[in-house]
Amino acid sequence: MPPSLRKAVAAAIGGGAIAIASVLITGPSGNDGLEGVSYIPYKDIVGVWTVCHGHTGKDIMLGKTYTKAECKALLNKDLATVARQINPYIKVDIPETTRGALYSFVYNVGAGNFRTSTLLRKINQGDIKGACDQLRRWTYAGGKQWKGLMTRREIEREVCLWGQQ
């Protein structure tokens, strides 16, 4: 993990899991995180319309140029949704850093994939390290392994493990 991102994530810890996930996704400067940023909608590597820091959905307006403030609002809304979707399935206490890494992960892969994952099963068995290690398995999109996803998962894994070692 780049030192600037590590420092930004550490600074976000007091703000809770959503703040941690937001910093992971946006990065220290707001456009150098795990998702990058595009203010104009585009199709991602699997053909899904995407805007800002990875926002997807029917509310994307094609042809619109989004502002930084609009992108921040979309991310905050999306991360609150992720939290509501997955928190009920996590049955054990986990550190906020682990939860923040999971929010970032689920923001990328979707709550449905998380709910049926070995990763969640391991968390609920109390095997946090084993769960965090499972992140390394999620590096494919469209049937192809992507270096960017490998890098992302290593960073999410590192944050997931904070406080565990």
Curated annotation (Swiss-Prot):
The record, for Pfam families, names: Phage_lysozyme
Q: What is this protein called?
A: Lysozyme RrrD
Tell me the InterPro entries matching this sequence. Bacteriophage_GH24 (IPR051018), Endolysin_T4_type (IPR034690), Glyco_hydro_24 (IPR002196), Lysozyme-like_dom_sf (IPR023346), Lysozyme_dom_sf (IPR023347), SAR_endolysin-like (IPR043688)
The UniProt record's further free-text remark is: Encoded by the cryptic lambdoid prophage DLP12.
- What start and end residues bound the annotated signal peptide? none
Coiled coil start-end: none
Q: Where is the active site?
A: E35 (proton donor), D44 (nucleophile)
Which biological processes are named by the entry's GO terms?
A: cell wall macromolecule catabolic process; defense response to bacterium; peptidoglycan catabolic process; viral release from host cell by cytolysis
Protein function:
Essential for lysis of bacterial cell wall, by showing cell wall hydrolyzing activity. Exhibits lytic activity against E.coli and S.typhi cell wall substrate.
Query: What does the record say about the knockout?
Result: Mutants are unable to form wild-type biofilms, which could be due to altered peptidoglycan metabolism.
Q: Which UniProt keywords apply?
A: Antimicrobial, Bacteriolytic enzyme, Glycosidase, Hydrolase
Question: GO: which molecular function terms?
Answer: lysozyme activity
